[in-house]
């Protein structure tokens, strides 16, 4: 039975880079991993495969949306450390529903029988809008993980994600494993002071603190995971949080909780006092 992870976060905060490095850390510890990009940008697996691969929606268009005509090879690319990548894709700009495409991708995974092939399945999901389609991975996930930075907009999005996780937990097994603090900068960004308080308030924890480092940014543009980059000063330090996350997730009983989110209006008042 696969361990299913749903990684969410506000767009533009390094969610896909973090997801790819978590997948890499898990794979290097012996897990067979499938990473599924659930964002219309369809670049989640770029650091793993080194290219923008064909999306599920593109493959479906080629067979006039007859799911039964597709095979795993039509939509999956294998990359770094044997990680398999799949991209849901999205409709043309200005038309259709990206969440619907995510739902279609989940259906395809079931039809292809892929849930039993992997040790870990990681959904990398757009977290700005948690509509029915984009929340679909929570129906299958053992654990949700939120990627966030130490600022109000990111925390507001994280709080909305906590609402979705809380709601889904009523009918499904999903729990929140924790928050990954990304781009942590103690010189200008306040470290994790706001995230620490938010995590305590909603009843979760910080899984790890990923430092703000130029090497991580460069790895993204190079189409590589951080693990695949040449050894340079700072690399070992940057790898630590990804390995910590992988070790935590591979425990037999990963600590997790059902979050208690803050009300939309209340969060403006509360977070304002954390500056």
UniProtKB/Swiss-Prot annotation:
Its cofactor is [4Fe-4S] cluster. It catalyses: chlorophyllide a + oxidized 2[4Fe-4S]-[ferredoxin] + 2 ADP + 2 phosphate = protochlorophyllide a + reduced 2[4Fe-4S]-[ferredoxin] + 2 ATP + 2 H2O. GO terms for molecular function: 4 iron, 4 sulfur cluster binding; ATP binding; metal ion binding; oxidoreductase activity, acting on iron-sulfur proteins as donors; oxidoreductase activity, acting on the CH-CH group of donors, iron-sulfur protein as acceptor. Its EC number is 1.3.7.7. It comes from the Bacteria. Transmembrane segments: none annotated. Belongs to the NifH/BchL/ChlL family. This is Light-independent protochlorophyllide reductase iron-sulfur ATP-binding protein. It comes from Chlorobium phaeovibrioides (strain DSM 265 / 1930) (Prosthecochloris vibrioformis (strain DSM 265)). The gene is bchL.
């Amino acid at each position: 039975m696969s361990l299913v992870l749903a990684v969410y976060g506000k767009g533009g905060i390094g969610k896909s880079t973090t997801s790819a490095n978590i997948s890499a850390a898990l794979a290097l510890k012996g897990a067979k991993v499938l990473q599924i990009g659930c964002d219309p940008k369809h670049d989640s697996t770029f650091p793993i495969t080194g290219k923008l691969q064909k999306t599920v929606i593109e493959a479906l268009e080629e067979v006039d949306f007859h799911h039964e005509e597709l095979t795993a090879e039509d939509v999956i690319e294998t990359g770094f450390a044997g990680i398999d990548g799949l991209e849901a894709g999205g409709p043309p700009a200005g038309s259709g529903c990206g969440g619907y495409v995510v739902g279609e991708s989940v259906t395809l995974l079931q039809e292809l029988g892929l849930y039993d092939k992997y040790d870990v399945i990681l959904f990398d999901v757009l977290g700005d809008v948690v509509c029915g389609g984009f929340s679909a991975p929570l129906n299958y996930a053992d654990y949700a993980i939120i990627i966030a930075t130490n600022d109000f907009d990111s925390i507001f999005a994280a709080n909305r994600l906590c609402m979705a996780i809380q709601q889904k937990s009523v009918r499904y097994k999903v729990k929140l494993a924790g928050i990954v603090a990304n781009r942590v900068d103690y010189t200008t960004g306040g470290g994790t002071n706001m995230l620490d308080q938010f995590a305590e308030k909603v009843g979760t924890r910080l899984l790890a603190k990923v430092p703000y480092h130029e090497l991580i940014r460069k790895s993204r543009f190079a189409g590589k995971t951080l693990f695949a980059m040449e050894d340079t000063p700072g690399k070992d330090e940057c790898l630590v949080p990804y390995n910590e996350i992988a070790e935590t997730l591979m425990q037999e009983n990963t600590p997790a909780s059902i979050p208690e989110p803050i009300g939309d209006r209340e969060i403006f008042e509360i977070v304002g006092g954390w500056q």
